[in-house]
Amino acid sequence: MIPLSQKNLVEIRKHSLEDYPNECCGIVIGLAGSVDKDILFRCTNIQNKLHEMDPKTYPRDAKTAYNIDPRELFGIFNQIDSKKLVLKTFYHSLPDHDAYF
């Protein structure tokens, strides 16, 4: 289990409530072995856009799926590389449905 600061746990909960009824998604990065200076990124869930463009390939909408904007991912991973940080976790909410896999 990845430890997260209380501040980031509160922020993730807030994010999920604000994006409801859609899934929220985000990424936490920081220094290895520490949670004090972790950086939380709220990411854009582009699942509805993908579903509208191609419902056959993307049959689920943002109420039951998430897909992070690749430009945001690129920017976050650039920060990881340039600042010598590590990826701590991806997060997303599960509004009104269970985890399934």
Model-identified regions with their sequence ranges:
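Conserved beta-strand-loop surface patch within small alpha/beta domains used
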Residues: 1-86, 95-101
